[in-house]
Amino acid sequence: MTLTNVAPLTASEIKQLAADWYLKLDVHAPLEEYIPFLAEEGLEMRFPEATVYGFDGFKGWYERVIGIFFDEVHTLKQVNVQPSADEASVQVIVKWEASVWNRPAAKSQRIILDAYQTWIIKRSLNTGKPVIATYIVDSLSYYEGSAQL
């Protein structure tokens, strides 16, 4: 669908979207705070462990992972934006650090990796703001000494 009379997506607003998204993930923000970031229709999110669709799919994934990972830190390393008519393809590299505790281990373990991702960003049909329509984790590159997923 092509939106008419809508400003083209800009690299600066997409970079801000990415920074805000990862800040929310770091603090395990309440679920409703993610609604403005995600496309109302056609949302697809491909994680290493699952592919989910729509906000309900995201909700199930998010509720699961915030029960597993803690002390998270996301550091944006790269956000490359390639705009087209009514969307933008974005290559994201984010350094992700998180702790995980697996029963009955005496201590938690630290995961440190770079996640290579592809996002498709569109303008919200309701607000006109940029939203994530497609979110794909393409690959993970672990740092030396990191625990593994």
Regions from the language model: what does each represent?
Residues 1-41:
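Short, low-complexity N-terminal intrinsically disordered segments enriched in polar/charged residues
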Residues 67-71, 97-112, 142-145:
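Short, cysteine-centered beta-strand-loop-beta hairpins and adjacent loop/turn segments enriched
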Residues 2, 109-149:
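Short beta-strand edge/turn micro-motifs at domain boundaries
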